[in-house]
Amino acid sequence: MKLISWNVNGIRAAIKKGFLDYFNEQNADIFCLQETKLSAGQLDLELKGYHQYWNYAEKKGYSGTAIFTKQEPLTVRYGLGIEEHDKEGRVITLEFEKFYMVTVYTPNSKDELLRLDYRMTWEDEFRKYLKNLEKKKPVVICGDLNVAHEEIDLKNPKTNRRNAGFTDEERGKFTELLDSGFIDTFRYFYPNLEQVYSWWSYRGRARENNAGWRIDYFVVSKGLEKNLVDAEIHTQIEGSDHCPVVLFLDLDK
């Protein structure tokens, strides 16, 4: 089973830059998007053979998530069920026979960490939400988690120590998530692989110089460890400031 996650930084812009070619070529079983930057009714996307689920932010041109899946899910849920967290279209949960699929666009802590306090609350509520799902069946989480977990996960750890996405607080929350029974799938397969990133700033030729951050993830319940086959980061794919990340699962194991 092939799963892909991509922060497209605006799906309409990504379509103009070859999104559909990549989508069709990959033929994923489940394809998740973050930062769609759409309002309802703005885009009619024909994806033959896929069921589409979109969660929109109330604010125009902001945030938003989507999941395209070949198999129809048993249930669909938008958001966490907490009003203060559900206005920005950040979470979609699909239930399948053997697992839950959750895509998430984690709130950015912003310049000067203006939103760090909100981010900390979000992290705790989101982890609680995942652990509740896990009582029923294992969970696959994917998306832009807006944190580089360890120094290996970004090009310039020293100079970014207090910047959004690499604060001790954000990294600590990701550690808490893993400690609560989840696996960072890319590091599971490639614990020491350096200079593989999923996001590059548009400033200062960052992508050209590979001055990136690995902030896009597939994280799975430990109960799915035996089903993990491989993880990939498609750094060659352009069209956004992020690149797609991929997980292969064998659910028949």
Where are these regions (language model features)?
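N-terminal, active-site-proximal structural segment of metallo-dependent hydrolase catalytic domains
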Residues: 1-47, 57, 62-63, 149, ...
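Surface-exposed cleft-lining segments at the edges of enzyme active sites
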Residues: 81-82, 107-123, 158-162
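Structured beta-strand-rich core segments of catalytic domains in phosphoester-bond hydrolases
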Residues: 37, 42-109
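Metal-dependent phosphoesterases centered on the DNase I-like endonuclease/exonuclease/phosphatase
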Residues: 51, 125-211, 215
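Active-site-proximal beta-strand elements of phosphoester/diester hydrolases
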Residues: 1-9, 98-110, 142
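Surface polyanion/phosphate-binding segment centered on an Asp-His-Pro turn
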Residues: 232-253
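Active-site beta-strand/loop signature of hydrolases that rely on acidic residues for catalysis
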Residues: 7, 23-41, 101, 130-151, ...
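Conserved beta strand-loop-helix elements of the APE1-like EEP
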Residues: 60-75, 196, 203-226
